């Protein structure tokens, strides 16, 4: 069984895409973020033979997130953990326990991601235990694993910096 997890945040003014605030109002940022999330979910929904999940922060108890799960027939769960690394580890471990053998996780920051990148990640998991999608800014847009996640990879990670990719590869 395969699972695709998309990490999303509840679209609350002042809580999403905060680095855009000097340029856009909090309400405009929320609308932009909703568009990002809707676009990426719409693309992911085209994948066949993959169960799709929304990993929601801080909770899935949000009208927009409920609407997405209903419209696109997704399953959802609340992210668990103190930082992004713990949230990623917990999402993978919980879904491996449910019987999933191949899991790919993406964020909602890349609405223009070609869906072929996600398909390619699943293909690479047939021969590899772990895959990543590197960003040009030194971060990651995708993490995939087969059968287990190596939690040490995500511990003491300097999230939201240009060092994530380098530290992941070490």
Question: Which sequence ranges carry the predicted segments?
Answer:
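Active-site oxyanion/phosphate-handling segment shared across diverse enzymes
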Residues: 149-170
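Active-site rim beta-loop-alpha module in soluble metabolic enzymes
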Residues: 135, 145-147
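N-terminal nucleotide-binding beta1-loop-alpha1 segment
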Residues: 1-19
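Short phosphate-binding loop-to-helix
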Residues: 66-102, 161
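Conserved donor-nucleotide/metal-binding helix-loop-beta segment in metal-dependent transferases, i.e.
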Residues: 111-138
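Short beta-strand/loop segment that forms part of the nucleotide-sugar
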Residues: 49-58
């Amino acid at each position: 069984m395969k699972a695709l997890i998309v990490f999303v945040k509840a679209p609350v003014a002042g809580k999403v895409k905060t680095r855009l605030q000097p340029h856009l109002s909090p309400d405009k940022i929320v609308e932009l973020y909703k568009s990002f999330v809707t676009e990426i979910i719409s693309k992911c929904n085209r994948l066949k033979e993959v169960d799709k999940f929304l990993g929601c922060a801080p909770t899935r108890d949000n009208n927009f997130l409920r609407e997405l799960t209903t419209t696109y027939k997704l399953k959802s769960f609340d992210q668990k953990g103190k930082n992004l690394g713990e949230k990623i580890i917990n999402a993978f471990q919980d879904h491996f326990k449910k019987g999933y053998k191949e899991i790919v996780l993406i964020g909602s920051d890349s609405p223009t991601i070609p869906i072929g990148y996600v398909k390619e990640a699943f293909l690479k998991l047939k021969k590899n235990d772990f895959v990543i999608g590197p960003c040009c800014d030194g971060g990651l847009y995708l993490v995939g694993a087969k059968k287990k996640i190596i939690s040490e990879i995500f511990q003491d990670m300097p999230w939201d910096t240009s060092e994530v990719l380098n530290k992941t590869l070490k």
